[in-house]
A protein has these predicted regions:
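Soluble, acidic/polar mature domains that operate outside membranes
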Residues: 1-168
């Protein structure tokens, strides 16, 4: 009897649960703003509208603040920021190409002149994300994808990680 129950349980997991687990992983991956490039970040640059720039670079096993001055960076702070970028998921997103049809533009989302620009390099390639206005509800942000084709609505945890005041 126990052998029969084990076989039934195995069949249930194999035929019912495993496809659902794979489906959930696929959905999670689709909601991520960045792909695998966010796992191998070599440098980060944060610039605001006024031109203030903060740059972090990875040197061997440690991170260094290289602009506006040179200083060893706090490993935990940088780790928190890189983890936020790796796990950043959008609540929703829409194509930039659809904006003209609705009579809107990047400026309506604060992305024509973004409050903040976040640039990172990974494996020698540069990725730039523009961070725009806070949504009407106030707990989310508009960001423009690195390829410039999608606007993502993300949680404000991104702003908190990079030190952006939410009223900016």
């Amino acid at each position: 009897v126990l052998l029969f129950l084990n076989v039934v349980l195995f069949c249930y997991i194999y035929f019912y649960d495993l496809p659902r687990i794979d489906e959930r992983k696929t959905l999670e991956a689709r909601r991520r703003v960045y792909g695998p490039e966010a796992a191998t970040i070599d440098s980060l640059t944060r610039s605001n509208r006024t031109g203030e720039t903060v740059k972090l670079e990875k040197r061997t096993d440690s991170w260094w603040l290289t602009a506006p001055y040179e200083w060893p960076a706090d490993r935990n702070a940088v780790s928190g920021l890189t983890n936020t970028l790796q796990l950043l998921e959008h609540e929703t997103s829409f194509a930039v190409a659809e904006l003209a049809q609705s009579g809107r533009s990047l400026a309506d989302y604060g992305l024509a002149d973004p409050a903040l620009t976040l640039q990172f390099t990974s494996a020698g390639k540069s990725y730039t994300t523009k961070i725009g206005d806070v949504t009407a509800v106030g707990n989310r942000l508009y960001i423009l994808s690195p390829d410039g084709t999608r606007i993502h609505v993300v949680n404000r945890s991104l702003a908190e990680s990079i030190g952006l005041p939410l009223d900016s």
